[in-house]
Amino acid sequence: MNRYKEAGVDVTAGYDLVNRIKPLVAATKRKGVMGSIGSFGGMFDLEELGYKHPVLVSGTDGVGTKLMIAQKMHKNDTVGIDCVAMCVNDVLAQGAEPLFFLDYIACGHNDPERLADVVKGVAEGCKQSGSALIGGETAEMPDMYEPHEYDLAGFSTGIAEKEDLLSSSLAKAGDHLIALPSSGVHSNGFSLIRKILFKDHDVSLDDKPAELSGKTVGETLLTPTRIYIKAVLPLVKKHLIHGIAHITGGGFIENLPRIYDDNLQAVINKGSWPGLPIFDYLKKIGVLSDQDCYNTFNMGIGLVLAVSSENVDAVKEQLNTENEEFYEIGKLTARPAGKAKIVIE
């Protein structure tokens, strides 16, 4: 045994992992990709895309403590989708098309089979979003992490014509708020969820509470975050929307006000979309207030679009073409003096 392996770092396992993920990476290749996995840096040729005034838009994020659920369940092949979704949906919210993605995995012990499952999910998320997986890093850090632990983060870069970029100045009073449903909890609020389920209550991930209609708690919590690129990017390129809010950490209360200026107020009609059973369950056993829920969770909505009255029918028609479910949940109005930027009533 070499001295580095004695210290807890198995370089051979790293080589094994690279060989396992090569076909996964190759399956995400798209126009503009240069080189292949194994170089010191990933390369992408923007000229091939034919933009007139290109602006690059970057985003980075992780999966948070949802990873602890995946590790407890020994199910590691979906959290990579979450990682990509958290990044590319943010890039989309600026009006950009995701181009390429890089991942970072830190672990206590490099188990090539397990980490290849993680990258399998990353590659799937890249395919769903049209991103090329052009690089990544796996850092084996004994003593920093327990052998069964890993962390996952990602970095997305997208592109937009300068004139297509979305900013808060575009939204206007009278804009309709069109919401696209989430698939579940997505990747935020898991510290509160874990406290409610495992500290305040003795819930098992294998439990099947009546509210979840036959699904286990673990299965429900691990449902991957939705990726909205296919449904929404055409709306951006047709200049049909004024803003996109990705409902992530901080829920509605924090994220929706980011897409309009301080002189506007979002009035949300609670009950204008069907709730998801997982949120009813968490609210009940966690004894959570509405404020707790809307400050923490997506409450069944993953993305909100601000759309002018002139374009709302065209947006709905395009979403129907993509077989995308949507709900009209409210409007932007002039903000009364001294009032909050968002009201849920």
From Swiss-Prot:
Pathway: Purine metabolism; IMP biosynthesis via de novo pathway; 5-amino-1-(5-phospho-D-ribosyl)imidazole from N(2)-formyl-N(1)-(5-phospho-D-ribosyl)glycinamide: step 2/2. It catalyses: 2-formamido-N(1)-(5-O-phospho-beta-D-ribosyl)acetamidine + ATP = 5-amino-1-(5-phospho-beta-D-ribosyl)imidazole + ADP + phosphate + H(+). Pfam families: AIRS, AIRS_C. GO terms for cellular component: cytosol. Keywords: ATP-binding, Cytoplasm, Ligase, Nucleotide-binding, Purine biosynthesis. Its EC number is 6.3.3.1. One of its GO terms (biological process) is adenine biosynthetic process. It comes from the Bacteria. Gene3D superfamilies: PurM-like C-terminal domain, PurM-like, N-terminal domain. Its main location: cytoplasm. It is found in: Cytoplasm. Transmembrane segments: none annotated. One of its GO terms (molecular function) is ATP binding. NCBIfam families: purM. Belongs to the AIR synthase family. This is Phosphoribosylformylglycinamidine cyclo-ligase. It comes from Lactobacillus acidophilus (strain ATCC 700396 / NCK56 / N2 / NCFM).
